[in-house]
Amino acid sequence: KGLAWPVQIAPYHVQVLATGKDEAVFDVAEQIASALDADGVEVLYDDRRRVSAGVKFADAELLGLPYTLVVGRDLAKEGTVEIRDRRTGERRSVPADAAAAELSSTVRAALEAARH
């Protein structure tokens, strides 16, 4: 699986991936990335438009950041995005409008746990 940065020393806490070609996907991904950034979460936003989802996922694996948020096809169908925890392998779908708050809370809890 490769590198898995501990949250307290990772260069970024979260990588936000926008997949597909739908402009709405990129808009939502940017909104979530901005909200996370405003809340003090260190974010790497992959907004490359001419790169396939497979390449983005492979790059995310190589980077090994603690959390990945995927905005893609489920947004249009269900209004959800996916949060992936690198350490545990857990994947969960959350409503797009709650994703920033939930992920911010998750990062803060992980940072707090790492301090003790």
Give the positions of each predicted feature:
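NTP/phosphate- and nucleic-acid-binding module
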Residues: 1-116
